[in-house]
Amino acid sequence: MGPDFLKPKAPLGKKIQCLSFTKDYFYKNNISPEKSRILKIFTKLEDIPIQYMNQVHGNRLETIFSHSAFPIDETDSLFSSTSNLALGVLTADCLPIALSKNDGSEFAILHAGWKGLLSGVIESTLTSFTKGCSDVSAWIGPSISLKNYEVGNDLYESFMNKDDGSESNFIWKGHDKWL
């Protein structure tokens, strides 16, 4: 596997697999990035459907009990305890975050951009796990790099107003710009 195909070094949860690949991987290898075939191409899990969502940069969570042929509308987090089901997220600049109980009984996938982070997409998803989140593991997939994501003072101040501990995540660039 090259740098265009990534997975966590350690398992996220029992029987939970995470895969992340870039659009370039498909083009370089002359593979059609058709969503319905992704698991079949890259794993032995050809009969497992992937549930996608139409992401809106918010914090809405949808609990999935069974696969739908259509993406779940207006949501940024999918949660399930259903076996033989994969949850999928499409990202560019935003963070793909996978969560799972260590025993694999509950799992979630999040689309976490700055709007979702400010509105609590991670926190709202963690509340869905039974018996709290002390035995929940996370994997954050690839996203835009710090050096390529300049933001203004307004966004910096929004994060500081939510949590002043956010300051360590920003680098002052000057002229009301932050990385």
Labelled PLM ranges:
Residues 1-179:
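Active-site microenvironment for binding and transforming phosphate-containing groups
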